[in-house]
Curated annotation (Swiss-Prot):
The Asp-Asp-Xaa-Xaa-Asp/Glu (DDXXD/E) motif is important for the catalytic activity, presumably through binding to Mg(2+). This is 9-beta-pimara-7,15-diene synthase, chloroplastic. Its cofactor is Mg(2+). It catalyses: 9alpha-copalyl diphosphate = 9beta-pimara-7,15-diene + diphosphate. It comes from Oryza sativa subsp. indica.
Amino acid sequence: MASPMEAVARSSLVLAPRRRRALGLLPAAAAPFVLDCRRRHNGGMRRPHVSFACSAELDTGRRQLPSTGTRAVMSSCPGYVEGRMVGENTSQINMGREARIRRHLENPEFLPSSYDIAWVAMVPLPGTDHLQAPCFPECVEWILQNQHSNGSWGVNEFDSSASKDILLSTLACIIALEKWNVGSEQIRRGLHFIAKNFSIVIDDQIAAPIGFNLTFPAMVNLAIKMGLEFPASEISIDQILHLRDMELKRLSGEESLGKEAYFAYIAEGLEESMVDWSEVMKFQGKNGSLFNSPAATAAALVHRYDDKALGYLYSVVNKFGGEVPTVYPLNIFSQLSMVDTLVNIGISRHFSSDIKRILDKTYILWSQRDEEVMLDLPTCAMAFRLLRMNGYGVSSDDLSHVAEASTFHNSVEGYLDDTKSLLELYKASKVSLSENEPILEKMGCWSGSLLKEKLCSDDIRGTPILGEVEYALKFPFYATLEPLDHKWNIENFDARAYQKIKTKNMPCHVNEDLLALAAEDFSFCQSTYQNEIQHLESWEKENKLDQLEFTRKNLINSYLSAAATISPYELSDARIACAKSIALTLVADDFFDVGSSKEEQENLISLVEKWDQYHKVEFYSENVKAVFFALYSTVNQLGAMASAVQNRDVTKYNVESWLDYLRSLATDAEWQRSKYVPTMEEYMKNSIVTFALGPTILIALYFMGQNLWEDIVKNAEYDELFRLMNTCGRLQNDIQSFERECKDGKLNSVSLLVLDSKDVMSVEEAKEAINESISSCRRELLRLVVREDGVIPKSCKEMFWNLYKTSHVFYSQADGFSSPKEMMGAMNGVIFEPLKTRGN
């Protein structure tokens, strides 16, 4: 069975010849302007680097990155120049978006937190009476200058409606102003806002910040004690205090480190009698803060002086002035989250150098076991996953502090049952590179169980993270197709999303840029894919492959495999080369399986052995002739293009890989005819070649933008990547095609394993053993792919990993090329269905 392959994207092969002629882009005999381009850029009539160099589409606004050999030629072609002019305005907009994203990657910016600013404003100048002077007058000034027109303070970026978060921030700002006896008008308007929206406080259907049922009542009491005329009836205040009492009652039945951490985290909003500040200060970090929270640290200073805490607040105010954020420092978590988002929505390749700088810095902090990385659970988990997937040498032993569920439950995140932290730990556990990583195994076990429990409860129902949890549990990172993954993430991306801590923590407008850039990038990919399919359909007709009665109609599935493996639009040559090669391997597979006699099979192999001397061999039948000429013309065309890109002849290597493939198919056919039962070793040696990775992946690698040395196919690293991927794909195919092949009287690894055991092993046990082998090969494959000290270029190694993921998805339910309904559904989603974003 041939391999399901992805490809690469964006190239000169995108338009079918007839369509190119219709658009005036590439006449059959080459229009004068094409010939002129060739003369200018290639010296007279010498062959250009790529066959259809001037067939670029009109620019739709996104900056195009044509295949390597195409760019110089395209620059003076009329179609290209016109397209560039049409898209100039959009390109400028995109450049602005990218610039803002880069700035945020380098130095994350978040909107000021009114709540935290208010608490920092309450800190008195050391050595003075508490009522004399603020230590940070710039924070007091910020409060005076930044009240909203409705009387509130807080983040209300997208609407002006009240929320518990805004009410909490407004009350904190009122208390800060009252403490320093300033802003009487602002206080009056703030109290009016609270009075108008007071019903929100006791509405349990409205989302609340962490600890709200404790902090808001405590601050109401504080306001009353300060002499403020609180704008609520005695009954309403009693209801608020009842909320606090119910929350305290709920918490009173347990004693744990997690509870202590939680109380310390929200200490600024607790009643004085409830707080032991000496216990709270046990959670002070090396930077002097409590949980990197300006509000909690400021509250500690209000109640007891501490040099380190004061130093922390000075560092915050020195950096931000009066615009204090709700968490600081947050750079690493924010930067890693942004990197993860860029990967998930498919635009990380546009920011590769920025991402490398962030990961280099993160790796240094990881090696130093820096608190900002190691002690924050979601940051630690995300750092491990991203560093490992990008080739940094991080050991799973460094996660020993989160190997057990008890560690999670004893943290603030665990005590709050934070789904995001749990999800990050689960994702990190799946990035295993060997069978001997028990920490990851334990972590994955308990985090996965807790996430499944959440799905069965109402905890996260109706929240955006519900979909993320369902997706992560259903599709491990090695079981997703990049284009489908990108589409799902873009459609579920919320540009208004914020981190809900004690108050909103919202990035400064960058989410809108991310969504716009990703949506346009994906739409451009779709347009490219659609043009490539038209080209492939024309190619199929020109080679009369659609007239072969013995072969399956597999062109769409072949292209889907290629697009799933090589998804960026700028790698079109690689993707089309891959798709054509897959389609041809399936034709050959069907030819040897059901469409030919032994004589015809031998005839086809003889013709390929002669290749350019094929006229010395007679065609045994019309089917042989059709298959050979389709193979001959396509391999030569792709070989000529690849040779131009690589500056040497590479066609011979592709022909050799085809010969190996056809000979292995012939061996398999001979076993079928003679009823020979091979040993497992014989079967695997032959069948991993019939998985067809050789003829499909090598030709695509030549178009990946890397100069590959002549003997790459003889390199040990290439050979091992090839072996591991072929083994995984073959075993995956065998498991899912077992029942069908049994009915056809064919053997595969499942049936051979059962036979070798003399029927002691059941079919299900054999499948389980093979699945274990697949898992082992997958881990070893990933280890080779992410390893930085190899000689194979990273982009080429990643193609093997992407191919594994494609194979896994294709064979997770059934033999991928026998499931047209499922594959067409996926194809429609990636190629034809428009994005359905949240309307941000």
